[in-house]
Amino acid sequence: MKRREILKATILGSGAAALGSIATEKSQAQQTLATNLNPQKSIDVLIVGAGNAGIPAAIEAADMGGNVMLIDKNDFVGGMLIISGGHISGANAKIQMRKEIEDSYEKHYQDAMRIGKFKANSELLALATEHAARMIDWLEEIGVEFTDESPVLVDDHDHYSVPRTYIGKNLARSLLWPLQQELDKRISRGNLDIRLETKALNLLQDKNKKVIGVRVKNKSGDISDLLAKTVILTTGGYGANKSMQQQYNPKVVSAKWVGLPHATGDGIIMAKEIGAKLANMNHLISYPGTVFDLKGFPTAISTRLQFPPKHYTQSVWVNKKAERFVNEHTTPDNRETAFLKQEELFFYVVFDKNVSEQLGTLDIRNWTREQMDQEINSGNIIISAGSLKQLAAKLGISSQGLVDTIREYNERIEKGKRDQYGRTKQRRIINKPPFFAFGVGGSVLNTHGGISVNSSLEVIDEDGMVISGLYAAGEVLGNGHLMGEGVVSGMSVGPAITFGRLVARTAYRNAQCQCSDETV
């Protein structure tokens, strides 16, 4: 089967063995379903979501000899791998060892715990770090090409103690292309079926509350039941679902979702309907640094800020109260913490003609000097004015407040006093007109809350009891399990692949020893 067929076509599944009767209703069922259907007549492993965790899970389950089905509501596979940076991390992978970098999965675990403020799930973090090297080695074996510099320390987040983050030469697509090829092989072999444009609606349960399948709807609106001995949810996060953000994370609703529109929390919603426990739902990190076109705000994104150590700004950052709120050169964790306290998750970068003329590298990533001059003239992204009061008026913030903030900043430089936020580098007086500013907001690429699982990746309920037949992996778990309250380099994409492979083995083994006393 050609890759484009996977990407764009709806591929028929295993037929009547996996297909229940077609329902006449066209609307989504809202209640938890209970049925007497016999899962012994169904597929072994049904995987819902053909993305970062779902593809590896399908490959692994098929390799174990299972009768496997993979479904996705999109008309393509790959999920967030299509757009993400694809950073993965692990200790003692072969690439790292060839470079003679001393590391261990214990150190990886300890670093991740530290960066996550010791709020990560210890069992799941240990599982992820212990198996990370094998995951990276496997990716290399199937043809993933990492940059020559990998593993590296990533500056966008707090650093590990040693370089252990791997980046594909074409970012996440370097991972996706080989994974697609491996998926093709299993489909051609005959024990893996895939259905695209197939949206999961509800989880099916028998009288004993064991999950035995999924109710789905195809693009024509037809509803059917797919029966399975085990079900794995790999549906991703909920960043594109504003109502869920409003319910669980109202403070970050104003942040711009920069992922794909399919991340609507479907798996989380379905699991919660049948009693699954959710975790970390009140925690969602909005990353500072998204530069907006102010005339098109909040929908028009321009690019991103550059941060230390690649770039130390000569500008100052002020919030909507016209006040500085952080050392502009601080650590990623301190920067994110300070940013999350700001009104509407927004601030302005303010500078003057002196700074604009002296900039060695620009605050805005990938901009040239010529582009900066063009944007100053257009006034879409960079706003200019002859005085600080006029600039504040254009920005809609306190004129006197901005004047006072810049005056205090300048006076401390002139008098040789310590910066009130501890900034030590690139302290230049801002006093030469014209004055400039551009707006910076927050963005959300993934979500921290999701389904709770045990160390076997079985979904658990509010009492900690296993919901039989149901498993989960990837962002549907939420990154908070592994990142705690921080952002840990390579601990979203990497563990999704790792957990996808691990959960497939567990689900398949359990499918093989399963018997049901229920009859149709």
Name what the model sees in each region:
Residues 1-14:
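N-terminal secretory signal peptides and thylakoid transit peptides that target proteins
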Residues 64-81:
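Glycine-rich FAD pyrophosphate-binding loop
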Residues 226-294, 493, 502:
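Glycine-rich loop(s) and the adjacent beta-strand/alpha-helix scaffold that form part
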Residues 41-43, 221-230:
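Core beta-strand elements of the Rossmann-like FAD/NAD(P) dinucleotide-binding domain
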Residues 401-484:
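A glycine-rich dinucleotide-binding beta-alpha-beta segment and adjacent secondary-structure elements
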Residues 130-222, 242-243, 291-293, 413-432:
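Conserved redox-cofactor binding core of oxidoreductases
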